[in-house]
Amino acid sequence: MKVIKTIYQLSIFVAILFFCSNLTFAQLAEDYHPIKLKGEIPSDFLKRIKGDVQLKYENSLRLNSVQKEQFRVGTEYILRDIFQQGNIYFNDPMTDYVRKVGDNLLYGTDLANDITFFVSRFNVTNATTWQDGTVIVNIGLIACLENEAQLAFALAHEISHYIQQHPYLQYGRFVKKQQVENNSNVFVQNTDRTLNYELEADSIAINLLKKAKYNYNEGSKVLRIVRREYERDAISFVRYLSSDKFEIKEINLCKPISYQDYMENESVSSKSILSLDIRQRKLIKRLSRVEYQVSLKNYILAKDLFKKIQSIARFELVEQTFLSSNYLRSIYEALSLLNDFPKNKYLHIKVSENLYYINSYNDLSIIDRIFFDQKKIEDEVYADFCCFINKLTKEDMRKMVFGFVQQQYQNYPSDERMLIIMAKTVEMVYDMEYAKSYYEKYVKLYVDGEHFLMAKKKLEQ
């Protein structure tokens, strides 16, 4: 009877979990509220802010006491800076999910208490490992992955770096090289060793995935994703940004130089790309020698749960690139998400807000300051969009931005975010006299609003 009751309770729990997952997707279809750090700060988070890190390694390179202390202090300083700056999430669904996948990999090992997984706000498609057992996964990576097994490979790769003491070895060999004078081969040797560490971590990661019953063949796809060799569907910015105030025409568009051409023409170092290429070929070769097991899975946790977490990471990418003033990238990420969530209010409003700031920079003739990805763009659609923005005249930019913002305001006339964007845009494109009614509406509707004092001050001028 007890067993039947337990099974019944478990089935209810699973049903609730499934319902919550669907409910979250329904919410994402309509709107999104960026993650805010709240609640009690976890002890593992505070530990890194306080600098209470314990590095575990065998001193195979025989560093002296001063060098070991420098390694500890350096690790402590960088981690404290990353965590204090608010770059790491806590009490959030992404971190919980990543840790569950990590637990699957560490189950039955002696490492469960040594490694702690965190998720960062960084948009780079990457993850990092520290010798104290800290593993940080960027939202930029989570947003691009296609399934749980790929995330498992990324985590297993970082776990392998910790197991093999690669952070310590990199530091130790760097210190030893500082003692060698006039060594012209230092950089080449260091690059070769770094590649060897990556190849070693890839190989060990396959064993970890195999043991945890994950489909290790997904590993080579992760390297493809890191190289940005994957399809990304984004809605047409030509159609989306056009309005009755400004219609984007063929004459406004341009075809910028491709990233690959830039690499060849400007002699930019391609060592990182070459390294990934070697890793991918070696990994595919390694996988071809492993006997495939039918029982291996792309998902151990629920597939819907991964999709939900990936979507959250993509929404966070829109928000974080905006907060870092990377307005062009934020719009591009929003355009990509609009394929899956065409009626999401947050996305439409965030594009409006990004455009407002782009126009502000353009009016001041300093628009070049927001082209963070200039000459580093691998995605053709994104490159086309950046080139289009750069080519617009000031007058055309004003028309396009005002037309789009006005269109979104008509769709969401009482939304606090949209109302203040409309007020600021009208003031920027025309003057305060035209914007006055929008500020008055904001002050009337949102007494406790985020922009209430600013709006009130505008009206008092």
How does the language model describe each region?
Residues 141, 145-150, 158-175:
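Catalytic Zn2+-binding segment of zinc metalloproteases
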Residues 165-189, 223:
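Post-HEXXH active-site segment of zinc metalloproteases
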Residues 27-77, 81, 88, 108-111, ...:
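C-terminal capping/extension segments of zinc metalloprotease domains
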Residues 94, 113-115, 131-135, 147-152:
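Envelope-exposed proteins and targeting segments
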Residues 118-133:
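Catalytic zinc-binding patch centered on the HExxH motif and its immediate surroundings
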Residues 178-211:
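Post-HExxH zinc-binding segment in Zn-dependent metallohydrolases
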Residues 1-33:
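Bacterial Sec-dependent N-terminal signal peptides
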Residues 90-109:
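Zn2+-dependent metallopeptidase catalytic core
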